[in-house]
Amino acid sequence: MAGRSELVVSFGEMLIDFVPTVAGVSLAEAPAFVKAPGGAPANVAIAVARLGGGAAFVGKLGDDEFGRMLAAILRDNGVDDGGVVFDAGARTALAFVTLRADGEREFMFYRNPSADMLLTHAELNVELIKRAAVFHYGSISLIAEPCRSAHLRAMEIAKEAGALLSYDPNLREALWPSREEARTKILSIWDQADIVKVSEVELEFLTGIDSVEDDVVMKLWRPTMKLLLVTLGDQGCKYYARDFRGAVPSYKVQQVDTTGAGDAFVGALLRRIVQDPSSLQDQKKLEEAIKFANACGAITATKKGAIPSLPTEVEVLKLMESA
C-alpha cells in the first residue's frame, strides 16, 4: 500500500429512503413521510468524506429528479461522483423505512428493476477504481444481473491494482428471492475480502447459529482475511485479526435512529486504516481505530436519518474525550 492514495471507493446502491414523520408506527399507519438519501455504500463514502478523507462512489442512478439529487448530495458532501452513471430507462430505487418504537428499522423496497441493478461492467470507471486504497462494497449489488457481473469485475480491477477489499454484506432479506440464495451469493465472494464486517443478525443468518461466541464467529474467518468484525449495536464490537482478537465497548448515547450507524462505523474504520494501514497488524492501533469507529456509529444513532447524522472528526474526538 506504500505510496498509494488514501482514497476509499465505495461501490453499489444509492437510493431514497422514505421515513415516517412519526416513530413507532407501521408503514400503513404513518401519517406522512420525509425523503432521505440512503444506500449503505453511499453512506460509507459520505462518512469517509465527512471525516476529512478522500471518497468516491461507483454506481448507477435513474436519470430522474431523485437520481440527479443524489448525485448532487455526493458532490455537496465532498464525494467524487466520477463513477456515477445515469439510466434513462429505469428509476432511482426507493425504500420505505419504518422506525419502530425502539429505533430499529423495517423496510419495503421499490426496485423492479431500479437503475442501480442495471449497471454494466462496460460502464465502470476503471481509472477511478484503480486509484482506490480501499474498495468497499455490500451484497445488494450481487442480487441481479447485470450489476452482479459489474460488481465482480470491479472487485477484480481493484484487487489487481493493489487495493484492500472491504465487505459489509448489509443483509436485506426482503430483496432476495430466498434465504438460501441470499446466503449462497453473500458467501460466494467471502474469500476475496481483506476486511469483513457483519452484524449480530448477519452472523446468525450466515452461520445458522444464534451466538456471538468466538467459535461461531470463526466459521466466517478465512486465512486470506486481514480483519473480521462483528458489530453488537450498543454493546460495541468484536474483532478478529490474523495474530490477535478482542472486543471494544461502545459509547453510551441516547439512540434515536440506528439508520446509517453501521455505515458510519465502517466509514470511520476505513478512514483510519487508509491513514495507517499498519493498524491491521498492530492491536493497540487497531483498537484505537475501532474506538473511533464506535464513536462515529454512536453519534450517527443519536439523530434521524443516515447522511445528516454522519459526524465530523471533531465531533467524534469530542465524544471520545468526554467518555
Swiss-Prot record:
Record Pfam families: PfkB
Gene3D superfamilies, A to Z: 3.40.1190.20
GO biological processes: fructose metabolic process; starch biosynthetic process
InterPro entries documented for this protein: Carboh/pur_kinase_PfkB_CS, PfkB_Carbo_kinase, PfkB_dom, Ribo/fructo_kinase, Ribokinase-like
Broadest EC class assigned to this enzyme: transferase
Cellular-component GO terms for this entry: cytosol
Listed EC numbers: 2.7.1.4
Pathway field: Glycan biosynthesis; starch biosynthesis
Tissue expression profile of the protein: Expressed in root, endosperm and leaf tissues.
Protein name per UniProt: Fructokinase-1
Organism from which the protein derives: Oryza sativa subsp. japonica
Gene label: FRK1
